Regions:
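Active/binding-pocket-proximal capping segment
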Residues: 1-2, 58, 248, 336-347, ...
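Short, loop-centered acidic/histidine patches that primarily coordinate divalent metals
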Residues: 340-344, 367-373, 379-383, 407
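Short secondary-structure boundary/capping segments
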Residues: 72-75, 263-265, 354
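Secondary-structure transition into beta-strands, especially the periplasmic turns and strand N-termini
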Residues: 120-127, 236-242, 330-332, 374
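Gram-negative/organellar outer-membrane beta-barrel architecture
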Residues: 1-172, 177-179, 297-301, 375, ...
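C-terminal outer-membrane beta-barrel translocator/porin domains of Gram-negative envelope proteins
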Residues: 1, 141-328, 339-340, 347-349, ...
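Active-site lining segments that contact anionic ligands and/or coordinate catalytic metals
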Residues: 20-22, 34-36, 51-55, 176-178, ...
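Strand-loop-strand
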Residues: 349, 353-373
Length: 408
């Protein structure tokens, strides 16, 4: 973006023109079911003199649901004739999935954020501090996948992140570590709005039930804590060597009022961990290889008694990984294989958080980095423990997982 505004001008006010600035516009759609548009700007030299980062972003997305008529007929067919959801004549279905989307049932999201970061000199030069302010508006219309199906919900939050990175290579680290601790917090609206949340929205059959839900979640409140770490240890001194990677992750989503737990920003645990649209769109996706997507967090919501149920996802999770890697090709194109053991779990009630109660898995995989494509990979993992799925309680068993993009 150097000299984008005027000829031979290196800076325009406080904002530098050039020096690694990034301007991005992204649009995604799969037709009438889902679409999103986002734009962002970032620079690492805000203020001209010091390496301070600055970023601003905007996004909008819309996701539609299928009609109740189609859902009921597909269920009837699957029970009586073995038919299921399908596209056209696939799976012997008489219904075209895309043509029976109900645009009157949807969730729309609009959001904006602004962030500032600074490299620290203490305890050492590898530390960085980030602060951000974000706002998201959830606009729901007959959206049956959330605790609240209709209305507008607002999320205004402050994010604080302290991180340290000392790895020797971004694509295939041999030595060093990555640590990150973060807090996202909203104003404690329930402490000063004067509402009695203990007696709101208790009777789903009440004529005022949806209005009471809107009052309860017009402004979302929570405090969200996360810790992530990775370490890399080369087992020999050669360039192509075995590298041992260890990972520890934990996350907790707390509330200021036990009767106003947030139905958003929960943890969706299990599977490949790839982000993207889903029925529980306003959630954080956490991978756990060897299990179906979301099956670990769903199991916790199904088995734990948490009083007022506000989400089918988890409010706490942990994840531990031991991974052995070996590079087949290094450079602009990087290819390496890996084998791993992994353990983790999720809890709907954070009072029951137990880092030693783990769902375990093991497997092998490969990663390929291509300059024009980015990082891709495939893993095969076997889950040793039972989780709750649509078929009841079953072992994770053998699972293939596809990976796109770099994960922290």
């Amino acid at each position: 973006m150097r000299n984008l505004i005027g000829k031979n001008k290196m800076h325009r006010g406080l904002m530098p023109i050039g020096d690694g600035e990034q301007l991005g516009i992204n649009f995604q759609t799969n037709g009438s079911y889902y679409s999103s548009l986002s734009t962002s700007y970032s620079t690492n030299w805000f203020g001209n003199k010091r390496p301070n980062s600055f970023s601003v972003s905007l996004f909008y997305s819309k996701q539609s649901d299928i009609s109740s008529y189609y859902r009921n007929n597909a269920l009837y067919n699957s029970l009586n004739y073995g038919y299921g959801y399908g596209y056209g004549m696939l799976n012997n279905s008489y219904y075209n999935y895309e043509s029976l989307l109900d645009d009157d049932k949807n969730i729309r999201m609009f959001g904006a954020s602004i962030g500032w970061g600074k490299r620290l000199r203490w305890p050492d030069d590898y530390f960085q501090f980030m602060a951000s302010v974000g706002y998201t508006r959830y606009m729901l219309r007959d959206w049956s996948y959330f605790y609240i199906a209709n209305g507008n919900c607002n999320n205004l939050n402050l994010g604080l992140t302290l991180s340290r990175t000392s790895t020797d290579n971004q694509l295939f680290p041999r030595r060093g570590s990555e640590f990150m601790v973060s807090l996202a917090v909203t104003p404690p609206w329930s402490l000063f709005d004067g509402k009695d949340y203990a007696h709101l929205a208790l009777d789903p059959n009440s004529a005022t039930y949806e209005g009471e839900l809107q009052d309860m979640y017009r402004w979302i409140e929570y405090h969200k804590w996360k810790f992530k770490s990775r370490t890399y240890t080369a087992l020999t001194n050669s360039q192509k060597c075995f590298v041992l990677m260890t990972r520890v992750e934990m996350g907790l989503l707390g509330s200021f009022n036990k009767d106003k737990k947030s139905p958003f920003e929960t943890f969706y645990v299990g599977g490949d961990g790839m982000s993207g649209y889903s029925y529980g769109y306003a959630e954080e996706t956490i991978g756990m290889r060897g299990y179906d997507n979301g099956s670990i967090s769903t199991s916790s919501a199904y088995t734990e008694s948490t009083g007022r149920r506000t989400s089918n996802n988890a409010y706490g999770y942990d994840r531990f990984t031991l991974e052995l890697r070996y590079p087949f090709m290094l450079g602009n194109t990087t290819i390496y294989g890996l084998t791993f053991v992994e353990g983790g779990n999720a809890w709907a009630d954070i009072k029951k958080f137990n880092p030693f109660n783990l769902k375990k898995s093991a497997g092998v995989g490969v990663r390929i980095f291509l300059p024009m494509v980015g990082l891709m990979g495939i893993d095969w993992a076997y889950g040793f423990d039972k989780v709750y799925t649509s078929g009841g309680w079953t072992k994770g068993g053998g699972q293939f997982h596809f990976i796109l993009g770099q994960e922290f």
